[in-house]
C-alpha cells in the first residue's frame, strides 16, 4: 500500500481540523460526523473514552469529565494563566512535579493525565480522520500549527503530543504564517508586504504582524489576549440569561453545573445563528427542576452585551502595530482567522483600517490547516 502523504493539522483550543494537499490544492477533511472541524474535547464516561463531537456532546451531562486541555500545554502549575483558568474549569487540576495534571474518574478509578496526553488523543482523532479519507494504511507525517507566541517549552510539548499519538511531526509552523500561505500571500511578487493576521477563536485572541518578501516570512510582532474569544461572548449571554431565568421562575441555576453547561451550549448555538440572522432563539427543555427555558436574543442585544469585548479587540491590534513600528496605513493585507471572525461586528475592523478589504474568503476555521 502506498505511503500516505503528510497532513496539516490545526490543533486548536476549541476546535481542530486536518487537511491534505491533493489535486493541486489543500483539501480539508470531514470527520466521521461529516464536520470539517472537530471539537478539541476528550470525555470519559463510566464505560468509554470519547473524542471530538461525541465528547463535546457530553459536556452538559458529564462536565467534570469532559476535557479541553490546550491552555495547559507546556505550562507550569504555578503559571498565573493556569491559576486563572482553573477557576472556570469544571474538572480538577492537580500538581505533579511542578506540572499541571487533570484528574478524573474513569471506570471506577481515579486517573490523571498531562495536557499533552489529552491533546495527543485529539491528534490521534485527526490522524484517524485523515486515514479514513485517504484509505491509506497509516498517516504518520504531519505539519502542526501553533500560535506565534508559543515558547520553546510549548512547542516541544506540542511535538510530544505527536510522539504520544504515534505521529512524526515534520514541522511546527506559526499559525499566522500558515494563514498567510493559505491566502497565497507568499506568492505575490514585488516589494516587501506587511500583513496583519487577526485570529479570534474560541478561547484566545491573537494579532500578528508579518512581513513577506520573496516568499520569506518574518514575524515582526505578536499581541494577544488569552481570555478573549468566542467562549467569552458565550459567557456574556449565559450571564444575561441566568438572572432572566431566576426572575421568571424564582430558581437559581448557577450552582448546577449541568444546567449551566446546557445553557452555554444553547447560547453558543444562538451566537452562531446571529452571524447570519438578526435574531436567534434559545430553547432548552427541562433546563432546571423540570422547567423549560425559551427566549430569544437579537443581534443588537448580543452586540450590546459584548460591546466592551468587541472594542477590546482593537487594543491588541494597536499594540501589534506599535511593536512592529508600523502605522496602520502601512498594512497591505488583513487576514481574518478563527470562527469568531464571522461575527458581523468583528468584521467592522475594516473601519479601523479606513475600509481596507479583509481577506476572509477561506473558511476562518480552516485557514491554518495547511501543508507546505
Curated annotation (Swiss-Prot):
One of its GO terms (molecular function) is ATP-dependent protein folding chaperone. Disulfide bonds: none annotated. InterPro entries: ATPase_NBD, Heat_shock_70_CS, Hsp_70_fam. The keyword Transcription does not apply. It comes from the Eukaryota. Coiled coil: none annotated. Keywords: ATP-binding, Nucleotide-binding, Stress response. Belongs to the heat shock protein 70 family. This is Heat shock 70 kDa protein II. It comes from Paracentrotus lividus.
Amino acid at each position: 500500500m502506498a505511503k500516505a502523504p503528510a497532513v496539516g493539522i490545526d490543533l486548536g483550543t476549541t476546535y481542530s481540523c486536518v487537511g491534505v494537499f491533493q489535486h493541486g490544492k489543500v483539501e480539508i477533511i470531514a470527520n466521521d460526523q461529516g464536520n470539517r472541524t472537530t471539537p478539541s474535547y476528550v470525555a470519559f464516561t463510566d464505560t468509554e473514552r470519547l473524542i471530538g463531537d461525541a465528547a463535546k456532546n457530553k459536556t452538559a451531562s458529564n462536565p467534570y469529565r469532559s476535557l479541553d486541555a490546550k491552555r495547559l500545554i507546556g505550562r507550569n502549575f504555578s503559571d498565573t494563566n493556569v491559576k486563572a483558568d482553573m477557576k472556570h474549569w469544571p474538572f480538577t487540576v492537580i500538581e505533579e512535579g511542578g506540572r499541571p495534571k487533570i484528574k478524573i474518574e474513569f471506570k471506577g478509578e481515579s486517573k490523571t493525565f498531562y495536557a499533552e496526553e489529552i491533546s495527543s488523543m485529539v491528534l490521534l482523532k485527526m490522524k484517524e480522520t485523515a486515514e479514513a479519507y485517504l484509505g491509506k494504511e497509516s498517516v504518520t507525517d504531519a505539519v502542526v500549527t501553533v500560535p506565534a507566541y508559543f515558547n520553546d517549552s510549548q512547542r516541544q510539548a506540542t511535538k510530544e503530543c505527536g510522539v504520544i499519538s504515534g505521529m512524526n511531526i515534520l514541522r511546527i509552523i506559526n499559525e499566522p504564517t500558515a494563514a498567510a500561505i493559505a491566502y497565497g500571500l507568499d506568492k505575490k511578487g514585488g516589494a516587501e508586504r506587511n500583513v496583519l493576521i487577526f485570529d479570534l477563536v474560541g478561547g484566545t485572541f491573537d494579532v500578528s504582524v508579518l512581513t513577506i518578501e520573496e516568499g520569506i516570512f518574518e514575524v515582526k510582532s505578536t499581541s494577544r489576549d488569552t481570555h478573549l474569544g468566542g467562549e467569552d461572548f458565550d459567557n456574556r449571554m449565559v450571564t444575561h440569561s441566568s438572572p432572566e431565568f431566576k426572575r421568571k421562575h424564582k430558581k437559581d441555576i448557577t450552582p448546577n453545573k449541568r444546567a449551566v453547561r446546557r445553557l452555554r451550549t444553547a447560547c453558543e448555538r444562538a451566537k452562531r445563528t446571529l452571524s447570519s440572522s438578526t435574531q436567534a432563539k434559545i430553547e432548552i427543555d427541562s433546563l432546571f427542576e423540570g422547567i423549560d427555558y425559551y427566549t430569544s436574543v437579537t443581534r443588537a442585544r448580543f452586540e450590546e452585551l459584548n460591546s466592551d469585548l468587541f472594542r477590546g479587540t482593537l487594543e491588541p491590534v494597536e499594540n501589534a502595530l506599535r511593536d512592529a513600528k508600523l502605522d496602520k496605513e502601512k498594512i497591505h493585507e488583513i487576514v481574518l482567522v478563527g470562527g469568531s471572525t464571522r461575527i458581523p461586528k468583528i468584521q467592522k475592523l475594516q473601519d479601523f483600517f479606513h475600509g481596507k478589504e479583509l481577506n476572509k474568503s477561506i473558511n476562518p476555521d480552516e485557514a491554518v490547516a495547511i501543508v507546505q
